[in-house]
Amino acid sequence: MISIKRLSSADTEFDKALSELLAFENTQDAKLEAAVADILAKIRTEGDKALLEYTLRFDRVDAKSAADLELPRNRLQQALHNLPGEQRNALEQAAERVRVYHEKQLTQSWSYVEPDGTHLGQKITPLDRAGLYVPGGKAAYPSSVLMNAIPAKVAGVGELVMVTPTPQGEVNDLVLAAAAICEVDRVFTIGGAQAVGALAYGTPTVPRVDKIVGPGNAYVATAKRHVFGVVGIDMLAGPSEILIICDGKTNPDWIAMDMFSQAEHDELAQAILLSPDLHFIETVAASIVRQLETMPRKEIIRTSLENRSALIQVHDLEEACEIANSIAPEHLELSVEQPEKWVEKIRHAGAIFLGRHTSEALGDYCAGPNHVLPTSRTARFSSPLGVYDFQKRSSIIQVSGQGSAKLGAIASILAQGEGLQAHAMSAEYRYTKKIALGKN
């Protein structure tokens, strides 16, 4: 059997119970923090030498030189060529859908000219180099390659460098095939905090990047947090989440399996169902019990559902949307009639899946939108990974002679009000000196 929390929004203690359910303290392990700091410091000072030492210690790969840790491009093509046709076709179709979607996100530089000839605008520039971390070994995450590499390529990033560990020399061909499809420029068989450090600081072999993206274990996540500021990072991700709003008319087995799809990630993942239909909630609960025993990862699912998940009865769909906005979930399914109507009421969610046939898993792999999403209620102020994460914006200001006089006078007054005399004089010189010299 399995015991999942049952809550009702009508209970006087509901807000407290919901807050306790959502609470996730991403505690920092002092030993882990110290270990990561030591690894990063050694990579920064010793470069390739430290990288080889850590690769031998953690991955048990005895490379003779750091250059041996880089895979040749033909190795990626070989992995793609050796894939079974069905797998290759699925990867290529998913990649194309992700590419088409992200091309819609491209923004262009823009400018305008004021009547006095002053030119103002914004220049869009892709990053010079980005780093992509991909878990390796038996854990195959080709979808992570697609979701992180394709937006970078669409943005026009100059060079994309991928790192992926190969424990005991075990190379994951699915990951390499995905890298080939995405035209990743360089691939290094390194992982852990040492790989993050190499990307952030650079070594004689591994080039320094401007931004690091991609998922990883606690060491990788901690290392990304440590190097943030030296380089950019995508986000600090918490456990996976799904919130399902259902009117009670969807097949309960579908809803139960959608909850499983997040719960199987890890024991801290969260799956919540909101429905005004109590009978439907009970039917979903029964489906969970019935289907759980068929799941290969049933113990992980069980722990997640028992400790961090809930079945919640709400007054109506209006209230369900209000609660959803409070939760700001990573994934939100609107399994209801007229989902287009209800999505207008949603303000905070990483990705919103509309209708009964739109399972969250489709978004994870091949629908097109990115699956790198804000977690832990950060969808209140954060967005999915996208092309814009690999672009920078620079302001363009070209003031005409006539504009200099007008703006200089304004700037001078404001600068003097702030007690910054040099600012004021810098603004004034552009037009007072012209007047004195009789120039236009």
Curated annotation (Swiss-Prot):
Instruction: Respond yes or no to whether keyword Transmembrane helix is given for this record.
Output: no
Top-level class of the enzyme under EC nomenclature: oxidoreductase
Q: Which cofactor does it need?
A: Zn(2+)
Molecular function in Gene Ontology:
histidinol dehydrogenase activity; NAD binding; zinc ion binding
Instruction: Return one Gene Ontology term, BP aspect.
Output: L-histidine biosynthetic process
Positions binding Zn(2+) in this chain are 262, 265, 364, 423
Q: Quick one: which pathway? A: Amino-acid biosynthesis; L-histidine biosynthesis; L-histidine from 5-phospho-alpha-D-ribose 1-diphosphate: step 9/9
* GO terms under cellular component: cytosol
Report if keyword Amino-acid biosynthesis is assigned.
Answer: yes
Give the binding site residues for substrate.
Answer: 240, 262, 265, 331, 364, 418, 423
Function, in words: Catalyzes the sequential NAD-dependent oxidations of L-histidinol to L-histidinaldehyde and then to L-histidine.
Q: Could you tell me which HAMAP family the record lists for this protein?
A: HisD (MF_01024)
Can you name this protein? Histidinol dehydrogenase
